[in-house]
Amino acid sequence: MLTTSDFKRGLVIKLDNSPCLILDVHFQSPSARGASTMVKTRYRNLLTGQVLDKTFRSGDKVEEADFERHKGQYLYADGDRGVFMDMETYEQFEMDAESFQVIQPYLLDGTEVVLGLFQERLVSVDPPQVVELTITDTPPVIKNATATAQTKEATLETGLTLQVPPYLEVGEKIKVDTRDCRFISRA
């Protein structure tokens, strides 16, 4: 059993028999004498994908979820589902279409990922924080645009579109932050 003092971002707890990933924790001190500290959490139910808020009293106990993280690899898209392989056991898992649609723009065949398993079932896939992708379509280079804060839209090899600096051309590899879909630099 865990107490609220153990809560931190990234911890997976069990609420209503579902694994829930803690996204944010805020400890709120009492304003009146005798009141207890409140622990406000924002979490994602890993079975449904819902993001919810819940407030606990300091010292409340919760069960830690039977959640395991494994090194994995993205193999291929099977229709609208993704197929992943556990790098330790070579077991293959399919990810549902709704969850896969969110991370697919960051994945190329063979990309290493982190698989989240709950009761031997795939419930989450974390792509690398930074991926290298090739620009397949973007407007032509704008002359003398190196010192400006302008951006232009670029389409990458996975179909992802994002804003990039105006000096980038088709065929260039760039680094993309998968947490907020942001251009970082040339690869």
Curated annotation (Swiss-Prot):
Keyword field contains Transmembrane helix: no
Chief localization: cytoplasm
InterPro entries: Elong-fact-P_C (IPR015365), NA-bd_OB-fold (IPR012340), Rib_uL2_dom2 (IPR014722), Transl_elong_fac_P/YeiP (IPR020599), Transl_elong_KOW-like (IPR013185), Transl_elong_P/YeiP_cen (IPR001059), Transl_elong_P/YeiP_CS (IPR013852), Transl_elongation_fac_P (IPR011768)
SUPFAM superfamilies named among the record's database cross-references: Nucleic acid-binding proteins, Translation proteins SH3-like domain
Keyword annotations from UniProtKB, A to Z: Cytoplasm, Elongation factor, Protein biosynthesis
Any one GO CC term of the record: cytoplasm
Function, in words: Involved in peptide bond synthesis. Stimulates efficient translation and peptide-bond synthesis on native or reconstituted 70S ribosomes in vitro. Probably functions indirectly by altering the affinity of the ribosome for aminoacyl-tRNA, thus increasing their reactivity as acceptors for peptidyl transferase.
Family, as annotated: Belongs to the elongation factor P family.
GO term, biological process aspect, one: peptide biosynthetic process
Protein name, UniProt field: Elongation factor P 1
Protein biosynthesis in keyword set: yes
Top-rank lineage group of the source organism: Bacteria
Gene Ontology molecular functions: translation elongation factor activity
Pfam families xrefs: EFP, EFP_N, Elong-fact-P_C
Compartments it resides in: Cytoplasm
Pathway the protein takes part in: Protein biosynthesis; polypeptide chain elongation
